[in-house]
């Protein structure tokens, strides 16, 4: 009995690990990006990239900087799908957007912004979403702005998130290896 439980646990772990979706965050901006995920900030130099693996059950966001007034790349891996969207819903220093019904209404209610950096999410073989400026149509602009979430099978081989898409990609500074 214990052997069956151990084998099932190992196989379940392997299956979960096998379904990890690599998300590569690339910085085409002229300045560094502070990739933040509500727990950790990683600096991505201009022209450089970093990869995070999203496992089944992941639900969260990534943005440039710790300030919540930012363009968000939002992901959920659940029920056999990778769900993704860009959000520019304004938040304020003291309050969230509440029940606002437009981008302008949310900005007035929160006295805040939701856009800080151009961004594109491009899953392999699925619909890309792009937000180059405040008010972009591919992004959630207010809480009930339905229809902005997209889905891919969780077998999607990779996702590329690009900060400042369309900008000439700077050269990534060489990293020296210390012996």
Can you annotate each of these PLM segments?
Residues 23-179:
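Extracellular low-complexity, O-glycosylation-prone Ser/Thr/Pro/Gly-rich "stalks"
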Residues 1-22, 178-179:
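Fungal secretory targeting signals
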């Amino acid at each position: 009995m214990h052997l069956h439980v151990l084998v099932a646990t190992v196989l379940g772990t392997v299956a979960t690990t096998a379904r990890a979706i690599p998300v590569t965050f690339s910085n085409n901006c002229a300045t560094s990006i502070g990739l933040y995920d509500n727990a950790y900030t990683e600096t991505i130099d201009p022209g450089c990239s970093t990869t995070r693996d999203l496992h089944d059950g992941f639900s969260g966001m990534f943005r440039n900087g710790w300030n919540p007034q930012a363009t968000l790349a939002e992901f959920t891996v659940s029920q056999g799908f990778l769900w993704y969207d860009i959000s520019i819903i304004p938040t304020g220093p003291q309050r969230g957007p509440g029940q606002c019904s437009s981008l302008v209404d949310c900005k007035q209610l929160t006295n805040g912004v939701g856009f800080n950096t151009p961004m594109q999410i491009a899953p392999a073989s699925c619909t890309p979403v792009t937000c180059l400026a405040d008010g972009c149509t591919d992004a959630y602009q207010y809480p009930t702005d339905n229809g902005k979430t997209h889905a891919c099978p969780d077998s999607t081989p990779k996702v590329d998130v690009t900060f400042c898409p369309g900008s000439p990609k700077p050269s990534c500074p060489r990293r020296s290896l210390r012996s």
